[in-house]
């Protein structure tokens, strides 16, 4: 038997020793997650956060959260071509009970990527760092696979090293051309139908036939300084309360005062 007192075990029989169990969800609130107006389905879902208590503000706990949503859910379509693409949305501001999100990245599902890799073909991929017109630095990854043409009798369809370099160069050129002259909203609108990948597939047919060409991933490396008005424009609220407040404060109101008027001195504040 051990000698000494066990400080971890308290003597029973004391009144008030049992603490009242409080459900943690009673201290939390639900907020609606709103996607930008580039997508058909603006209501992405709901998220929980602790209520504002003391110096802990609820909106500060929401900002910076990243939500990953399938493109099929964002577009309200059950098309198989949309279900394997995932868009990341980041919470940037809170308006009442709405969490206003912005584009934060795109990715393909793991099962789609694994299903495309097969034998007897060449995998070609590239990555490009491009800056949009509104100051977002994006890293875009592209992937494609060679395919046999109708004339070939071979079992394999391997591309030569010079052809791979040529295809990779064409991928880089097209991605830069499509993104460097667009803002973030324009880039997302091009990612929805994957028009950049289709242009790459057409341009590379001259070098070697390709199939399963996709923009595999998009990362946001750098962002410009946060601007609430541009975020409200993305959500279709550009002429809302924030614009009215700014215009009202800028215009002001002219009040007639007699000459020599002095405001009264306040005794208490």
From Swiss-Prot:
It holds the Pfam family Ribosomal_S3Ae. One of its GO terms (cellular component) is cytosolic small ribosomal subunit. One of its GO terms (biological process) is translation. Keywords: Cytoplasm, Ribonucleoprotein, Ribosomal protein. PANTHER family: 40S RIBOSOMAL PROTEIN S3A. This is Small ribosomal subunit protein eS1. Residues 1-20, 249-269 are annotated as: Disordered. GO terms for molecular function: structural constituent of ribosome. InterPro entries: Ribosomal_eS1 (IPR001593), Ribosomal_eS1_CS (IPR018281), Ribosomal_eS1_euk (IPR027500). It is found in: Cytoplasm.
């Amino acid at each position: 038997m051990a000698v000494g007192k066990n400080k971890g075990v308290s003597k029973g029989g004391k009144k008030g020793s049992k603490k009242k169990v409080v459900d943690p969800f009673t201290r939390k609130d639900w907020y609606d997650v709103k996607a930008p107006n580039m997508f058909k389905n603006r209501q992405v879902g709901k998220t929980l956060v602790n209520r504002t208590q003391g110096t802990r503000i609820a909106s500060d706990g929401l900002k910076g959260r990243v939500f990953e949503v399938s493109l099929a859910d964002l577009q309200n379509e059950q098309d198989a071509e949309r279900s394997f693409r995932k868009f990341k949305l980041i919470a940037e501001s809170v308006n009442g009970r709405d969490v206003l999100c912005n584009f934060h990245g795109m990715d393909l599902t793991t099962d789609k990527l694994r299903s495309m890799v097969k034998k007897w073909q060449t995998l070609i991929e590239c990555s490009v760092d491009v800056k949009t017109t509104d100051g977002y630095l994006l890293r875009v990854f592209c992937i494609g696979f060679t395919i046999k043409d109708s004339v070939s009798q071979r079992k394999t369809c391997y591309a030569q090293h010079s052809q791979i370099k040529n295809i990779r160069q064409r991928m880089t050129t097209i991605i830069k051309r499509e993104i460097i002259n667009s803002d973030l909203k324009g880039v997302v609108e091009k990612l929805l139908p994957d028009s950049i990948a289709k242009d790459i597939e057409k341009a590379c047919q001259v070098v070697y036939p390709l199939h399963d060409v996709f923009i595999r991933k998009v990362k946001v490396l750098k962002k410009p300084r946060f601007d609430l008005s541009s975020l409200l424009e993305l959500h279709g609220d550009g002429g809302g309360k924030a614009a009215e407040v700014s215009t009202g404060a800028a215009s002001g109101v002219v009040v007639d005062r007699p000459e020599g008027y002095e405001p009264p001195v306040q005794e208490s504040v």
